[in-house]
């Protein structure tokens, strides 16, 4: 066999010699490279669902290439320049490769090259345009990198032709020419609210299960004491170490196999030998391709050397357009039911299965009604001196209502507070003073659980987070727990809580075929049996402690996460709560959650079969 055909046989698996000769002729006629044509064949084969009889599809494939010839020529030029640059890096030391490509007029029409319109400098406010990618693509998993831009321009207002513009008097840095001529939208400044002037104090902003039957039963029942027990293994004190990319990939792959996920169907499909079922973590094919169109399954045991995209032998999956519904995010463990394209590592997938949720806590005992309050930080008004008036008011509410349990989620000293550098107290002193305030103003009958946050400036920036360790003596009812945390109350029901921003992260990064609801977002978390199933994570996850993000062998009856606005939803019989901050952005003021977990109907005595989600009264009340 000719050496060139032997090379083609590796790129076009399943092709016979005659078909390979035709492919070679296409490459020569269109003056493209083998790598480009092989990649385009994969795309073409997936679109047309070609699994055999390649010969009859080669002429349409050549037409397909001709339609995209300009783009492919640019790709070829880019490959050639990069090869030269690798051999002699100094040749293009001060030149951008994209600039060289744009100079090749024979390959690209002038009409396709982005241009900057010649306009007077007064008509365009170029100083506000910056290259967003360079500021938004920080590695959030590295705590040593700043998560906020250090660019602090000064602003000066100018008027030109009665149009108010904003000019930033600073170096424009990496200027984004593609946005230079876009008009600037001048939004009205948000008026800061005065805390004392807030309205509807104590009013209900959101409720669930607030029906008369539960209220009547609640008034007849006697409150009992509350016994608390944490679930899961301790993982602190934390040991810091650096995770290499290879280590992170290996741990993520192994976690798929070690967790023993159960699915609605068997991994082996005996009814149809052409169908292949594969289990793994959804992983992006590249930054440009939509997740549903092409992805890897990290940890897929059917791959002999799966490496999450770094190896050409890793299987590539693509969802068919006729799938009625799906929801996907990177890091999600799924089972893909697919058909393989013969002679390749590509599969087109017509069904996706997610793991079955874990069962609920089983060893339940009879318990009286339990009252729980939940509040999320920040709790300060972000002034030049510490002002925790909202926390004082919350303590007064707790003192009057005397709930069994109070959850306080951080941040307690918020890193976004621009005034904290001006405070005379150290962060440790400020936190200890806050704990003393809770200790002195909250009844000893109320168990207070302090949950740290990644936005706490005085706590460890690693996830999962260990609990706070204050250097002050406190009553035994003030308890410090890790983030995330699962609590067993009176061996009757369970609450799982995390202050990580997993809800908003999933909303922004997940892919849905149809419109999604809050129940869909919560369902993603529950089906993954994990408090933070997204990878790559927007939280600084330590791979050494990855397993401590898993649910502790059961699904919590109540799942609590932070959210910008209050929400209560039932997903898979789990009561899911999104708790807003007490003090939000622009000094807006939020609400806290009040829960009453009741027994079943009095006539039925205690019935374990009625989910906690259906016998819990939920009220969000304004601070």
Curated annotation (Swiss-Prot):
May play an essential role at the early stage of chromosomal DNA replication by coupling the polymerase alpha/primase complex to the cellular replication machinery. Residues 121-130 have a biased composition (Polar residues). GO terms for molecular function: DNA binding. Keywords: DNA replication, Nucleus, Phosphoprotein. DNA polymerase alpha:primase is a four subunit enzyme complex, which is assembled throughout the cell cycle, and consists of the two DNA polymerase subunits A and B, and the DNA primase large and small subunits. Subunit B binds to subunit A. GO terms for cellular component: alpha DNA polymerase:primase complex. Its main location: nucleus. It is found in: Nucleus. Residues 113-151 are annotated as: Disordered. It comes from Dictyostelium discoideum. The keyword GTP-binding does not apply. Pfam families: DNA_pol_E_B (PF04042). One of its GO terms (biological process) is DNA replication initiation. Belongs to the DNA polymerase alpha subunit B family. The gene is polA2. This is DNA polymerase alpha subunit B.
């Amino acid at each position: 066999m000719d050496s060139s055909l032997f090379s083609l046989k590796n790129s076009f698996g399943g092709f016979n010699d005659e078909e390979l000769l035709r492919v070679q002729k296409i490459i020569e006629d269109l003056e493209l490279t083998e790598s480009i044509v092989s990649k385009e064949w994969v795309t073409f084969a997936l679109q047309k669902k070609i699994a055999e009889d390649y010969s009859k599809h080669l002429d349409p494939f050549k037409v397909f290439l001709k339609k995209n010839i300009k783009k492919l020529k640019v790709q070829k030029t880019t490959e050639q320049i990069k090869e030269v640059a690798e051999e002699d890096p100094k040749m293009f030391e001060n030149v951008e490769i994209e600039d060289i490509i744009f100079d090749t007029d024979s390959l690209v029409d002038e009409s396709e090259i982005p241009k900057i319109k010649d306009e007077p400098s007064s008509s365009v406010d170029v100083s506000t345009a910056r290259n967003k990618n360079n500021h938004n693509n920080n590695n959030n998993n590295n705590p040593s990198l700043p998560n906020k831009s250090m660019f602090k321009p000064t602003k000066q207002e100018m008027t030109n032709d009665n149009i108010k513009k904003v000019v930033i008097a600073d170096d424009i840095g990496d200027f984004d020419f593609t946005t230079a001529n876009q008009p600037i939208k001048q939004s009205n400044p948000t008026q800061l609210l005065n805390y004392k002037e807030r309205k509807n104090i104590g009013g209900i902003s959101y409720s669930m299960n607030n029906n008369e039957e539960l209220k009547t039963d609640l008034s007849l029942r006697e409150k009992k004491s509350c016994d608390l027990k944490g679930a899961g293994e301790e993982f602190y004190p934390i040991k810091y170490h650096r995770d290499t990319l290879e280590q992170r990939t290996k741990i993520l792959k192994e976690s798929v196999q070690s967790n023993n996920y159960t699915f609605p169907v068997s991994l082996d499909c005996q009814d149809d030998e052409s169908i292949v079922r594969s289990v793994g973590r959804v992983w992006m094919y590249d930054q440009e391709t939509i997740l549903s169109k092409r992805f890897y399954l990290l940890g897929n045991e059917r791959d002999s050397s799966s490496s999450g995209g770094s190896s050409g032998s890793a299987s590539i999956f693509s969802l068919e357009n006729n799938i009625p519904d799906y929801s996907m995010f990177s890091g999600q463990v799924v089972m893909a039911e697919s058909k393989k394209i013969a002679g390749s590592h590509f599969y087109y997938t017509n069904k996706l299965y997610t793991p079955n949720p874990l069962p609920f806590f089983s060893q339940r005992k009879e318990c009286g009604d339990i009252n729980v309050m939940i509040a999320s930080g920040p709790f300060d008004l972000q002034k030049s001196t510490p002002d925790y008036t909202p926390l004082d008011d919350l303590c007064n509410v707790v003192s009057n209502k005397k709930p069994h349990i109070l959850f306080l989620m951080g941040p307690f000293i918020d890193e976004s507070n621009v005034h904290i550098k001006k405070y005379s107290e150290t962060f440790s002193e400020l936190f200890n003073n806050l704990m003393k305030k809770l200790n002195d103003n909250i009844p000893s009958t109320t168990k207070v659980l302090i949950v740290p946050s990644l936005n706490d400036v005085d706590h460890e920036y690693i996830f999962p987070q260990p609990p706070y360790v204050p250097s002050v003596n406190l009553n035994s009812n003030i308890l410090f727990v890790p983030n995330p945390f699962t609590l067993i109350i009176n061996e009757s029901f369970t609450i799982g809580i995390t202050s990580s921003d997993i809800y908003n992260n999933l909303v922004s990064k997940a892919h849905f075929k149809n419109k999604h609801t809050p129940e869909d977002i919560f369902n993603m978390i529950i089906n993954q049996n994990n408090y933070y199933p997204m990878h790559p994570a927007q939280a600084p996850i330590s791979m050494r402690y990855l397993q401590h993000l898993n649910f502790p062998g059961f699904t919590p009856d109540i799942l609590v996460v932070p959210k910008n606005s209050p929400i209560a939803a039932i997903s898979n019989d789990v009561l899911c709560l999104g708790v807003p901050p007490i003090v939000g952005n622009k000094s807006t003021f939020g609400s806290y959650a009040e829960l009453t977990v009741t027994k079943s109907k009095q006539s039925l005595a205690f019935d374990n079969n009625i989910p906690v989600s259906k016998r819990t009264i939920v009220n969000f009340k304004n601070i």
